A protein has these predicted regions:
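Recognition helix of helix-turn-helix/homeodomain-like DNA-binding domains
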Residues: 26-42
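Conserved hydrophobic/aromatic packing and binding residues within compact polymer-binding modules
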Residues: 7, 21-22, 32-35
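Short basic helix-loop element that most often maps to the first helix and adjoining turn
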Residues: 5-20, 74-75
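Short polybasic/polar patches that bind polyanions
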Residues: 12, 23, 55
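DNA major-groove recognition helix of helix-turn-helix/homeodomain DNA-binding modules
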Residues: 26, 46-62
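Helix-turn-helix/homeodomain-like alpha-helical modules used for DNA recognition
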Residues: 59-76
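Short, conserved glycine- and acidic-residue-centered signature motifs
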Residues: 14, 43-46
Length: 76
């Protein structure tokens, strides 16, 4: 599952604001803001929507042993 750090890094790479990500993921701005600041973890559906939006933007989430470790541009 995506981490707050991955979300921030991916947004930066895509040059998206938190508002842009929220719109693309169809979640509230406060959901993105609170998640990225580590205030709370969104419900599973919202967390998946955030990850899908970033993936659709061309970002691949890197995970090792069930731990989020980074991002990279998608190869496809």
């Amino acid at each position: 599952m995506i981490s707050p750090e991955q979300s921030r890094a991916a947004r930066g790479w895509l040059d998206w604001s938190q508002d842009e990500l929220a719109k693309r993921a169809n979640v509230s701005l406060s959901t993105v803001r609170d998640f990225e600041k580590g205030r709370r973890t969104p419900i599973a559906n919202n967390l998946e929507a955030i990850e899908r939006a970033l993936t659709a933007g061309g970002i691949e989430m890197l995970v090792e042993q069930d731990r989020a470790v980074g991002i990279r541009l998608s190869r496809t």
